[in-house]
Each structure stands twice: as structure tokens, then as C-alpha cells.
Amino acid sequence: SNDQTFVVLSAMSGTTNSLVEISDYLYKKNPEGANEHINALENTYMRHVETLYSTEEYKEKTRSFLREEFNYLRSFTKDLFTSFEEKSIVAQGEIISTNMVANYMQEQGFNVCLLNALDFMRTDKNVEPDPHYIKEKLTDIMNEHQGHQVYITQGFICRNAYGEIDNLQRGGSDYTASLIGVALNAEEIQIWTDIDGMHNND
């Protein structure tokens, strides 16, 4: 069938809390504490790679992505830390989960397209979602990436009216899924929640 599915994912269970803890250490100017938490989180994800993927190709592809991600997190331990940096750190939870699921689905033979929510999810100056902007940008992006069975993107994260990384605050990924459903005139929106590990799909 020609049915297309658009999947919006949250961060993996416990990840957002860990990223907030890492941010707390950085606010308190404790890079050692932050690095300990970053290393622990990286080890957790590397263990998931071993169980999630069946081929060495996809294990290595995902490990390589994760190494880059966690090095990016470590880069925050060297600079001034503000709420802007915190939002960038917290956004990585969704970026990691969507990349891992996209790799998994590709390995399973699905024709998958991973879209970056930061390219189309935006709030206005009142910190409310900007539905016209979202519809216009997402329509353009979907037109550029036609012919996939499954589209995957991040829930919760967005850019604000000034183009800075931000988040939708309330409702998280469910809210993102609803906004995307409206923007694309989706036939239905299914919200799945299950706090166990990788099943946090909305």
C-alpha cells in the first residue's frame, strides 16, 4: 500500500532525567560530575546497541553516531553554561532515540526517512507552537523527501521564534505528534506510551 507512517519519538526512558542531571552539574560548575554521568549514559547506550542490532554494520554505524553525540555532550563541560546550553543538551535525548530507531528499521528492511524536528517545529514569540510555520516547512520537507514508507522525527524539541533550540514544555511528544498530524492532514494520530526502554513512541 501507499500508506505512509510518520513516527514521533521521545527520548529513551530515563535519558531526559540524566541529561537534566548533567546540566545541573554544569550549572554548579562541576564538570567532573557531569562527565561521570555522561560516561555512564554512554555505556548504557552502547549496551543497547549490542542487543538492538543484529548486524555488525548497523552496530558500528550506531556506535559511531553515539560516540559523536557523547563527545558533543562533553564539549559543554568546557564553556560557560546557560539555559540555552541546557536546552541543547536535553534535546540530544530525542536525537539519539530517533537515530537509533531509524537505524534499526533500516536494518529490518524498511524504507525510512529521518527528519530533524528542529528544521520545522517552531514556537512563536508567545512560546506557543506556530502552526502556519510548521505546516509550510514540513510540507516543503516532505516534498523534498518523497517515496518513503516511514518518516521518523523527534518529539518535544523545537526552535523558538529566534531560531534557538527550545522545547514544547507541556505535552512533549504527544503534542508534537498532534501538531504534525494536523499539518499533514493525517488520517489518524496514535499515541503510544510505555515507559519501558525503547517503547516510548507517541
Located regions from the model:
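Nucleotide/pyrophosphate-binding catalytic subdomain
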Residues: S1-D202
